[in-house]
C-alpha cells in the first residue's frame, strides 16, 4: 500500500465558516484573550496573581524584583501568544495586536 504524501496548508488559507464554531471563535477573540491578558498581568480582581508578565519583565531587566510563581508559568504566555497569532491570522488585525506589541519585545 502506497502512503499518501501530505502537504502543509498555510493557516491563512484555512477558513472556518460554521455557525457553531463561529460563536466560539468570536468568544475567544472578544472575551477570552482579553481576559487572559488581564490574568497574565495580574489585573483580575479576586484572582491569585500569576506573575507571568511580571516575571518576564524582571528577566528582561524592565522591572525589579524576584521571580514569583511556578517555574513553568512562562508556558502560559506562550500558549496565549499562540492563540493570539491564530486569531489574528484567521480574523484579521484588531485591538488584540496591541497586546502582542506589549509582550513580544519583553520576551525576546
Cite the ranges covered by each PLM segment.
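Conserved small/polar residues in nucleotide/adenosyl-binding loops
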Residues: 100-106
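Low-complexity, Ser/Thr/Pro/Gly-enriched N-terminal "stalk/linker" regions
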Residues: 1-76, 102
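Residue-level signal for functionally critical sites in structured catalytic/ligand-binding pockets
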Residues: 73-82, 107
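Generic hydrophobic alpha-helical segments
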Residues: 28, 87, 107-108
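Well-ordered alpha-helical scaffold segments within catalytic/enzyme domains
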Residues: 21, 79-95
Amino acid at each position: 500500500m502506497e502512503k499518501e504524501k501530505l502537504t502543509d496548508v498555510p493557516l491563512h488559507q484555512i477558513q472556518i465558516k460554521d455557525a457553531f464554531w463561529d460563536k466560539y471563535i468570536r468568544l475567544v477573540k472578544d472575551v477570552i484573550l482579553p481576559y487572559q491578558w488581564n490574568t497574565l498581568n495580574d489585573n483580575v480582581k479576586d484572582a491569585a496573581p500569576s506573575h507571568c508578565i511580571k516575571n518576564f519583565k524582571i528577566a528582561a531587566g524592565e522591572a525589579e524584583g524576584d521571580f514569583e510563581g511556578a517555574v513553568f508559568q512562562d508556558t502560559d504566555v506562550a500558549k496565549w501568544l499562540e492563540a493570539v497569532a491564530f486569531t489574528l491570522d484567521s480574523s484579521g488585525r484588531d485591538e488584540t495586536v496591541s497586546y502582542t506589541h506589549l509582550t513580544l519585545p519583553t520576551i525576546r
